[in-house]
């Protein structure tokens, strides 16, 4: 997969607000536009392949959940287990490996373009690197929310297809929050790597090594998923603990852990941008 680069100048506050004042006119303060930065990040994101791939991956995960439930349906019905079984089986491999790598590739492709277009240097010259970071964080949060909605939507459709009670679904919907935050944390991690490393290949190699290492640790001790940012999606989905999927305490704990990672990585990203600039 080749990285898509962009050499288009990043929008500044002046370009977002309109033409510059005429010489001799009243002085006008240049205010960085977060909205323009957010819009620009959405515009240049590699959406053409990421969203179809996310739908396909979540569909495959949901298919695994469907088949697992049908294979052991009598045993699950005897335990009165429905949504939690499909949720856990659908998200296990998806959250451990495939979806985190897809999210990472989506973010790394955009990050590699910043170096090719020398966008960080241009933003530093205009003192807009802070606005650029905020725009990236907002776009990453938006993409994370849509990713979480696709995942939850496909699992919901699978459960309804199996005849589960739709009224019970409300207990599981709060999982959208930690899943969104987990995807966001992965994106911010890769954005930070994108400041330190310049090539798409270097970013994805590093991400893959982190993922494999974290996967081995989480299999040995599921609680260790909290210390691995690439493993946060498994923690957010509660894939190892199906009985806790509907637990608000579990949702809150996972959300706090993911949000803490977002904060730490966002600070690292900001510091990295300052050094790069």
Segment roles from a protein language model:
Residues 2-56:
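Aromatic- and glycine-rich beta-strand/loop motifs that create alpha-glucan
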Residues 109, 120-122:
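Glycine/small-residue-rich loop that forms an oxyanion/phosphate-binding "nest" at active or ligand-binding sites
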Residues 3-6, 24, 28-31, 58, ...:
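Terminal transmembrane helical anchor/hairpin motif
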Residues 25, 49-51, 56-103, 107-109, ...:
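Secretory targeting signals
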Residues 100-115, 193, 198-201, 259-275:
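Transmembrane alpha-helical segments in integral membrane proteins
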Residues 122-129:
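Short helix-to-coil transition segments within interhelical loops
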């Amino acid at each position: 997969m080749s990285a898509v680069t962009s050499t288009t100048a990043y929008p500044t506050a002046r370009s977002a607000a309109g033409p510059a004042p005429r010489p001799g006119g009243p002085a006008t303060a240049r205010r960085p536009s977060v909205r323009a930065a957010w819009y620009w990040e959405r515009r240049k994101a590699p959406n053409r392949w990421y969203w179809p791939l996310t739908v396909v991956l979540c569909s495959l995960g949901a298919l695994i959940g469907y088949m697992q439930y049908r294979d052991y349906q009598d045993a699950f019905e005897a335990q009165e287990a429905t949504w939690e079984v499909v949720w856990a089986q659908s998200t296990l491999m998806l959250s451990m490996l495939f979806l985190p790598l897809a999210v990472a590739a989506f973010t790394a492709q955009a990050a590699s373009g910043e170096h090719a277009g020398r966008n960080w240097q241009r933003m530093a010259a205009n003192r807009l690197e802070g606005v650029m970071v905020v725009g990236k964080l907002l776009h990453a949060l938006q993409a994370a929310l849509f990713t979480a909605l696709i995942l939850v939507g496909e699992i919901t459709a699978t459960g309804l297809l199996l005849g589960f009670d739709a009224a019970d679904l409300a207990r599981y919907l709060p999982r959208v929050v930690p899943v969104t935050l987990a995807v966001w944390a992965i994106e911010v991690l890769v954005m930070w790597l994108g400041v330190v490393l310049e090539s798409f290949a270097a970013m994805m190699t590093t991400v893959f090594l982190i993922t494999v290492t974290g996967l081995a640790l989480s299999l040995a001790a599921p609680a260790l998923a909290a210390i691995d940012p690439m493993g946060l999606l498994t923690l957010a989905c509660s894939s190892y603990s199906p009985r806790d999927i509907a637990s608000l305490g579990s949702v809150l704990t996972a959300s706090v852990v993911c949000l803490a990672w977002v904060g730490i990585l966002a600070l690292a990203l900001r510091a990295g941008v300052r050094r790069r600039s």
